[in-house]
């Protein structure tokens, strides 16, 4: 079991971009999105093997989890020996292969 989680250098920007987009229509939903994202990070730190592996995206060590209440947003993460690394948070409609390869 991992002892916590860490964010990659991409996560802050991913979360802010998504929250700004959501805020245009519903400021309360944007706050709820950020809370749900961080709740997901904590959940994954306690249950790192639950996400689905997505080797089809070219990253065999990356797992994917949907954010509760915002199921179109995906958390991409890696299970490390002592923690979970939250790698990206992206909308599922994006070209995931191209975005993750950048």
What residue ranges belong to the model's regions?
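Basic, Lys/Arg-enriched alpha-helical interface segments
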Residues: 1-62, 97, 101
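Enriched for short, Lys/Arg-rich terminal
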Residues: 67-102
């Amino acid at each position: 079991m991992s002892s916590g989680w860490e964010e990659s250098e991409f996560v802050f920007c991913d979360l802010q971009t998504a929250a700004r987009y959501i805020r245009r229509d519903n400021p309360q939903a944007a706050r709820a999105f950020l809370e749900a994202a961080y709740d997901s990070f904590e959940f994954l730190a306690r249950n790192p093997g639950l996400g689905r592996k997505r080797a089809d995206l070219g990253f065999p060590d990356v797992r994917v989890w949907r954010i509760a209440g915002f199921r179109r947003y995906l958390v991409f993460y890696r299970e490390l020996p002592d923690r979970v690394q939250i790698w990206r948070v992206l909308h599922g409609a994006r070209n995931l292969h191209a975005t993750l390869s950048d």
